[in-house]
Amino acid sequence: TQTVAPPPPPPEDAGAMAPSNGPPDPQTEDEPAVPPPPPGAPDGVVGVAPHATIISIRQSSRAFEPVNPSSAGPNSDEKVKAGTLDSVARAVVHAANMGAKVINISVTACLPAAAPGDQRVLGAALWYAATVKDAVIVAAAGNDGEAGCGNNPMYDPLDPSDPRDWHQVTVVSSPSWFSDYVLSVGAVDAYGAALDKSMSGPWVGVAAPGTHIMGLSPQGGGPVNAYPPSRPGEKNMPFWGTSFSAAYVSGVAALVRAKFPELTAYQVINRIVQSAHNPPAGVDNKLGYGLVDPVAALTFNIPSGDRMAPGAQSRV
């Protein structure tokens, strides 16, 4: 679980140039004689909210495992693939208590809708963070085919009273399905089309880029765009998926919180959703209300809306 705090405002005398991460490229004799880039020219890796403060909280790891794990309980490692639901809940509460105003959850636990297990602890943690601590919670919708995740039906024309098709859900994506408190993010490709592997479900709120992702390596901090091979003979695997889409939207949420500090977490989510580029049907279970538009989220004239999710106030 990663948490993102709103970025501080830039100094008044700061220019629009991003800081340089290295010297300009040298010019060779057969290159055209053009002026070199000025000092401080960007290197192309800036990020959505480069001034945000990031707190990294590890709630699951391949390097560790529970002591004497049991597969009998609903939150067992055999049934819940991404850590445990309880460890996610503890991480969310810890992040909220540390003062994080945006919480990114780029992990997904997929369970059969007929047997979703006991998720009351996680639900209470999400309610606490979103309602009591006023944190924007952004989660990955999930990737079809990974750890029990699978696509749900898009729409049932025989039941217009249920436009998001909740009654036909076969696999729940947690924490995304707690959609009153969580903004679930699907993935699009480089052309803005829904990524085939992006898990569909009625909880998906918006979508963001999920391919051609650049990031920073945990070893050395240099730019990377793929996972290294895990076995001899394998090739690098480019970054893709809804985990990266969720991180993208978390950065947008940090910018919105910095620009509009008076908005509640629920109102920040409303601004991101209302400014998205809608799919042809207006909303669907793959893209939600559409592709996120950071500039529109920061500049459009959008009514603030309700301060809390419907019914949340009664539980405060």
Residue positions per predicted region:
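Topogenic and prosegment regions of secretory-pathway hydrolases and membrane enzymes
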Residues: 7-34, 93, 97-102, 133-136, ...
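Substrate-binding/specificity loop regions of serine endopeptidase catalytic domains
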Residues: 109-205, 212-246
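Loop/turn elements at helix/coil->beta-strand transitions in domains of secreted/extracellular proteins
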Residues: 50-55, 97-103, 131-137, 179-184, ...
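Hydrolase catalytic cores
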Residues: 210-287, 291
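Soluble non-cytosolic domains of exported or imported proteins
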Residues: 11, 78-86, 116-120, 169, ...
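Subtilisin-like serine protease catalytic core
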Residues: 1-81, 181, 200-203, 258-271, ...
